[in-house]
From Swiss-Prot:
Protein function: Catalyzes the reversible oxidative deamination of glutamate to alpha-ketoglutarate and ammonia.
Active site, renumbered: K128
Record-level GO cellular component terms: cytoplasm; cytosol
Protein name: NADP-specific glutamate dehydrogenase
Family stated for the protein in its record: Belongs to the Glu/Leu/Phe/Val dehydrogenases family.
InterPro entries associated with the record: Aminoacid_DH-like_N_sf, Glu/Leu/Phe/Val/Trp_DH, Glu/Leu/Phe/Val/Trp_DH_C, Glu/Leu/Phe/Val/Trp_DH_dimer, Glu/Leu/Phe/Val_DH_AS, Glu_DH, Glu_Leu_Phe_Val_DH, NAD(P)-bd_dom_sf
Binding site for NADP(+): T212, N243
Amino acid sequence: MTVDEQVSNYYDMLLKRNAGEPEFHQAVAEVLESLKIVLEKDPHYADYGLIQRLCEPERQLIFRVPWVDDQGQVHVNRGFRVQFNSALGPYKGGLRFHPSVNLGIVKFLGFEQIFKNSLTGLPIGGGKGGSDFDPKGKSDLEIMRFCQSFMTELHRHIGEYRDVPAGDIGVGGREIGYLFGHYRRMANQHESGVLTGKGLTWGGSLVRTEATGYGCVYFVSEMIKAKGESISGQKIIVSGSGNVATYAIEKAQELGATVIGFSDSSGWVHTPNGVDVAKLREIKEVRRARVSVYADEVEGATYHTDGSIWDLKCDIALPCATQNELNGENAKTLADNGCRFVAEGANMPSTPEAVEVFRERDIRFGPGKAANAGGVATSALEMQQNASRDSWSFEYTDERLQVIMKNIFKTCAETAAEYGHENDYVVGANIAGFKKVADAMLAQGVI
């Protein structure tokens, strides 16, 4: 049986066993396509059911999360934690609170996390979790009660050497605080390393808040350097206006680029003169308002609900909002308008059709598992500080982050070239991430 037939047969089986989970199917299909050339060159990676084991989570947890609102009404949400692979270290990955969360989305995120964490070079496995709870419009007390109920079940399954959750969409510093506080009460011990993204006064790390956005910009900067250019003077569009987008904007402008647009789920803002990051943070983090407020209050900025942020002419696009936000037509528009670099700050924000357009039009593309690995890398640095009862300076931690992102880019570029796909960072990221995990799994036996 040829490698193509082996992969096709396994993927057909995966579709049947995981019906109704399109995001998970999409993530697996992309990786399997890249791995065909590995299996042809190194057939031992097909031994002992390795591919099947890699695509099947070690553990999937689904649990009830009952909570009481401010009016005394009881609500019941569903909680998830997918502990996907621990060959390299304890499961590591965020918690997402959003109405769209279901098992398939958590599995897709957890699967991507395996390769992302592997690429960091740090000893962490892959996992992900969350709930279909919507924190929007909820009071602080309602969010606290939900987090406490969620942790009442989750605490049985996590620990600094077992599984270390963090934040994601809908889970920021406030939620991590409530989750950690309840874990501390349930476990009857102050186990700092059980969660990352903590507050600075109780075990958190400097740069963790900025890390995903900063890391994405460090990665795309390396992509640009590889073409003999500089990020300085480039025009950039950034989708989203949350944590990742905000700090990507901040770092890009620090390095001399001009960010000409950002967005949220309601619309997008054109900022031809650049973004006032302090104003954006005040609107989103303090007032928790829509991006339209930015356009109302900042001269030269305009708010739009028609069209798409991807319609703007730019040199670099950084999708930093959510999965599958950038489709094939958007990609064609970017290419027609002169975009030359795309790096994913979010998890799988580009559809397969968009990625294919990037390849066809020679747009250098940094996939999320590489470009947005700065967040989990700095989470692992937070774990190091917790384990040694230490606290590092902002400058030192940021330097570590820069080195990690440069090494990730170098690894992706060298691996892509080794397998005959020069400058295809998707192939490079998938193969490099896979080989490290696969070697560990083969060494540890069939478990």
